[in-house]
A protein has these predicted regions:
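Conserved activation segment
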Residues: 25, 32-33, 99, 597
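Conserved short strand/loop->alpha-helix "switch" segment adjacent to the catalytic nucleotide/phosphoryl-transfer site
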Residues: 30-49
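A short glycine-centered beta->alpha linker in the GHKL/HATPase_c
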Residues: 85-90
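GHKL-family ATPase ATP-binding module
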Residues: 1-18, 25, 47-49, 57-59, ...
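Short adenine-binding "F-helix/F-box" segment of the Bergerat
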Residues: 91-92, 99
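C-terminal interaction appendages of subunits in large macromolecular complexes
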Residues: 394-413, 428-433, 444, 448-450, ...
């Protein structure tokens, strides 16, 4: 078959009749959260991901290698690819153009036809029709069969038939949409959120070039908008090296696996470092499976069994006096798993847990075979890994003793609550909140200013242990950390997960970090967040962790006074009240919480009706892990580079 005949056949396979329709679109505008998760920031950005996923599907099928995303000046989004273009011919069953079917009927598209796409991305799979339904305006431009086709929509309804606008020698699809402000609470796109996802997609789909442009932000020197290109030649290998950039390597090489088992394409990259945590990130059809699933279980089984067999065969574990667990084999392991599954079955609370049993066996076999070969060919690396396993097992044994001591103390000391804790009267965790307050003096003001019915105060003197650099038993031996565990009512480690916590015993559903608005305060808050991220991640995942935002300034003019939370507010108030002259106003800079009296602290930072809390969330686990490792680890150059890049956002006291 000639190349020309092959292209013609492919065009015929992806035609109007290959678009399958499964259900209507009526409910999307009434219940948007059912389709995109929520109508806040996550749901807003999910619209972009749905459109990009369509282009990625074209790339996976081999017809697209360049995807451009642009945030326009009016906060609309344009996604452009160089694929085949959505079919525009008349759809046999629907009696309208295939383009209109794709954009107005939920679950309509080539991804539901195996002849068009073998695998398809997108968690909810609702496609661009959902984006159309939730957009004030959407314009589709199709470059296909030598012509430019265009159709415009408003709130999901076509504003006319598809029209031919001209001729072209290119192919592809361009979708421009503006989210409906009557549906979304937030309509401003975050550059960094989109950049993180596009970078992730570039690593997961090597050889595809993705770009992001922000026309809202123009460089005054070059007069060019903010722009970034994401491209990975080596895929997951580069992804793991990016995540581990600030960690010290245990072995030099990243083990790269790219194979197919039982018809399932499997890609895995893994690397060992000197840290004390396991960081494994799993994906199915480009979807981040946050809850894991059979592919993750298969990977862990493959790593554990292969390393144990090697260590037993070489006699390296013969002198160890206690058992080794699977966790020990994976301490210091960073890995990314990506599988492509034709019919994925998702389970779990957020539908991000893979349930296909056949995938687990396939991944386990692939990892076992590749890792066994690597260990045989690299005995020096194999010894370094097994030595690390022995060290991890020894530390875990010590950690269990320390953890048991924490748990036993809690039982023997009655309520087990620390003496410094000023508890609240209410016993219902859903109503209660606890402030983790920097310093005893600020803790005193907070105790006096709080509402004793539902607000508890735990003062923390000085900095807590940096858990990023500490072995697990050191964490459980730290008095300050034990005090936090006891105050929250939870104990580290469960039967199912040594790194888990018994969240059903938690005493507060709002845990609020309250530290000074200076560099030391920010450092203390970061140390506490690192503790939660590494040892109580489920607290963050449940949405229980917050950061208080005390004001930076109190500005007075006569009898009038106003608080300012940042430098911009202060300058604006100087202009408004003082005509630009700071000398005509009395400005007090709060360097510490202790400088505020109890009434001021209550009014600005603690009163539910007047305060601003920032909820700590994990938008992207791999990115969060990389940043915590960089900020709190030993490697200085990446941290310096991060600070230099973000220096404009920091408030430095002199």
């Amino acid at each position: 078959m000639s190349e020309e005949e092959k292209v013609k056949l492919e065009q015929e396979e992806y035609s109007a009749d290959s678009i399958q329709v499964l259900e209507g679109l009526e409910a999307v505008r009434k219940r948007p959260s059912m389709y995109i998760g929520d109508v806040n920031t996550d749901g807003l950005h999910h619209l972009v991901y749905e459109v990009v996923d369509n282009s990625i599907d074209e790339a996976l099928a081999g017809y697209c290698n360049h995807i451009q995303v642009c945030i326009n000046e009016d906060n609309s989004i344009t996604v452009r690819d160089n694929g085949r273009g959505i079919p525009t011919a008349q759809h046999a069953k629907e009696n309208k153009s295939a383009l209109e079917v794709v954009l107005t009927v939920l679950h309509a598209g080539g991804k539901f036809n195996k002849d068009s796409y073998k695998v398809s991305g997108g968690l909810h799979g609702v496609g661009v029709s959902c984006v159309n339904a939730l957009s004030d305006k959407l314009v589709a431009e199709i470059y296909r069969e030598g012509k430019i086709w265009r159709q415009e929509f408003c709130k999901g309804c076509p504003q006319g038939d598809v029209e031919i606008m001209g001729e072209t020698d290119r192919t592809g699809t361009t979708i421009t949409f503006k989210p409906d402000a009557s549906i979304f609470y937030v309509t401003e796109f975050k550059y960094d959120t989109l950049a993180t996802r596009l970078r992730e997609l570039a690593y997961l789909n090597k050889g595809i070039r993705l770009s992001l442009t922000d026309k809202r932000e123009v460089d005054p020197e070059t007069n060019q908008p903010r722009h970034e290109v994401f491209y990975s030649e080596y895929g997951l290998k580069e992804f793991v090296e990016f995540i581990d950039a600030s960690r010290e390597k245990l072995i030099e090489n990243t083990i790269d696996i790219n194979t197919e088992k039982n018809g399932i394409p499997i890609e895995v990259a893994l690397h060992y470092n000197t840290s004390f945590t396991e960081n494994v990130f799993s994906y199915v059809n480009n979807i981040n499976t946050k809850e894991g699933g059979t592919h993750l279980a298969g990977f862990r089984r493959g790593v554990t069994q292969t390393l144990k067999n090697y260590a037993d065969t070489t006699g390296m574990l013969s002198k160890l006096k206690f058992d080794i667990s699977g966790d020990d084999f994976r301490e210091g392991l960073t890995a990314v798993i990506s599988v492509k599954v034709q019919e994925p079955q998702f389970e779990g609370q957020t539908k991000t847990k893979l349930g296909n049993t056949e995938v687990g066996a396939a991944v386990s076999q692939a990892v076992s075979a590749a890792l066994a070969n690597y260990l045989e060919e690299h005995p020096k690396d194999a010894k370094a890994i097994v030595d690390k396993v022995i060290l991890a097992a020894t530390a875990r044994h010590a950690a269990r003793k320390a953890r048991d001591l924490v748990q036993r103390k809690s039982v023997l000391s009655g309520s087990g609550l620390p003496g410094k804790l000023a508890d609240c009267a209410d016993n219902d965790p859903a109503n209660c909140e606890i402030f983790l307050v920097e310093g005893d003096s600020a803790g005193g003001s907070a105790k006096q200013g709080r509402d004793r019915q539902f607000q508890a105060i735990l003062p923390l003197r000085g900095k807590i242990l940096n858990v990023e650099k500490a072995m697990r038993h050191r964490v459980y031996e730290s008095d300050k950390i034990v005090m936090i565990f006891k105050a929250l009512g939870i104990t580290p480690g469960t039967e199912e997960d040594s790194m888990g916590v018994n969240l059903d015993k938690i005493r507060y559903h709002k845990i609020i970090i309250m530290s000074d608005a200076d560099v030391d305060g920010a450092h203390i808050a970061t140390l506490i967040m690192t503790l939660f991220f590494r040892h109580m991640k489920s607290v963050i995942e449940q949405g229980y962790l917050y950061i208080a935002t005390p004001p930076l300034y109190l500005v007075k003019k006569g009898k009038e006074q106003r608080y300012c939370w940042n430098e911009e507010e202060r300058l604006r108030l100087i202009q408004e009240w003082g005509g630009g002259k700071e000398s005509s106003l009395h400005i007090q800079r709060y360097k510490g919480l202790g400088e505020m009296n109890p009434e001021q602290l209550w009014e600005t930072t603690m009163a539910p009706e007047g305060r601003t809390l920032r909820q700590v969330s994990i938008e992207n686990a791999a990115e969060a892990d990389r940043i915590f490792s960089m900020l709190m680890g030993d490697d200085v150059p990446p941290r310096r580079q991060f600070i230099e890049q973000n220096a404009t956002y920091a408030t430095i006291d002199t």
